[in-house]
UniProtKB/Swiss-Prot annotation:
It comes from Klebsiella pneumoniae (strain 342). One of its GO terms (biological process) is methylation. It catalyses: L-lysyl-[protein] + 3 S-adenosyl-L-methionine = N(6),N(6),N(6)-trimethyl-L-lysyl-[protein] + 3 S-adenosyl-L-homocysteine + 3 H(+). CDD domains: AdoMet_MTases. It holds the Pfam family PrmA. It comes from the Bacteria. The keyword ATP-binding does not apply. This is Ribosomal protein L11 methyltransferase.
Length: 293
């Protein structure tokens, strides 16, 4: 169905108040957007970190009387009569279909392809992971996921056990299994991610070799030959004591979700127990790998 969009500009400090005002005026959803396209990285849990100059965008049903909406908003103390705004009619689109049409098979390293479950594989003889991301992250399109997939593709995983810490869609754990790992363990704090991983594992015929846990349910003294964690720099630093004990002696560690500017602090957290390789960078992100001492 078609929609009407109302956009207004404000400061980050006032964005939440104006979001509430738009919802009270009948908006069905709110989007915060940086006026100047400045990225915001790594908000704290539960935090909505906003920009100094923020566009607040309300989405309204096409039948909404926008003159009445504007009149109501003019009564808000942060806006007033004649406040600056922009109203647009949005064309009707099948957004899910548009997203699916833009998700194409991607190659990582020498052997590995990530393929949308609704498309044909480009190479039947390759290692093909059929993926439906569902509600969890992890399609291979982000540089951090891509670097982790390339790293796994370059390893000899035959008969190995792999832990995917923060498994999301299960893409890394499933890729490891398809690349020869005997067993993979996925851990995530989000039950939706656990379900997406389970569904994708079944789609790829590896569900019997994949164990999935919420953190509170994971077995004690869990160990693996290879541990990969594609989360964020803050949690990687904070969880270093927990993650560092997961690889066996001589086991391998791969970390990503890290901005290049954060690499040094993450390396410092893991250097006491690992011999670290040179940091690999892709765009503004990086990957840290090493071997357990």
């Amino acid at each position: 169905m078609p929609w009407i969009q109302l956009k207004l500009n404000t400061t980050g400090a006032n964005a939440e108040d104006l979001s509430d005002a738009l919802m009270e005026a009948g908006s069905v959803s709110i989007t915060f957007q940086d006026t100047h396209d400045t990225p915001v990285f790594e908000p704290l849990p539960g935090e909505t970190r906003l920009w100094g100059d923020t566009d607040v965008i309300g989405l309204f049903d096409a039948e909404t009387d926008m003159k009445a909406v504007v009149a109501q908003l003019e009564q808000h103390p942060l806006l007033g009569a004649g406040f600056a705004h922009k109203i647009e009619q949005l064309e009707d689109k099948d957004w899910e279909r548009e997203w699916m049409d833009n998700f194409h098979p991607m190659r990582f390293g020498e052997r590995l392809w990530i393929c949308p479950s609704w498309r044909d594989v480009p190479d039947e003889n390759a290692v093909n992971v059929m993926l439906d991301p569902g509600l969890a992250f992890g399609t291979g399109t982000h540089p951090t996921t891509a670097m982790c997939l390339q790293w796994l593709d370059g390893l000899d995983l035959q008969g190995k056990t792999v832990i995917d810490f923060g498994c999301g869609s299960g893409i890394l754990a499933i890729a490891a299994l398809k690349l020869g790992a005997a067993k993979a363990i996925g851990i995530d704090i989000d039950p939706q991610a656990i379900q997406a991983s389970r569904d994708n594992a079944q789609r790829n015929g590896v569900s019997e070799r994949l164990e999935l846990y919420l953190p509170q349910d994971q077995p004690e003294a869990m160990k693996a030959d290879v541990v990969v964690a594609n989360i964020l720099a803050g949690p990687l630093r904070e969880l270093a004591p927990l993650i560092s004990v997961l690889p066996v002696t001589g086991g391998l560690l791969g970390l990503s979700g890290i901005l290049a500017s954060q690499a040094e602090s993450v390396c410092e957290a893991y250097a006491p127990l690992f011999t670290l390789d040179p940091v690999v960078e892709k765009e503004e992100w990086c990957r840290i790998t090493g071997r357990k001492n």
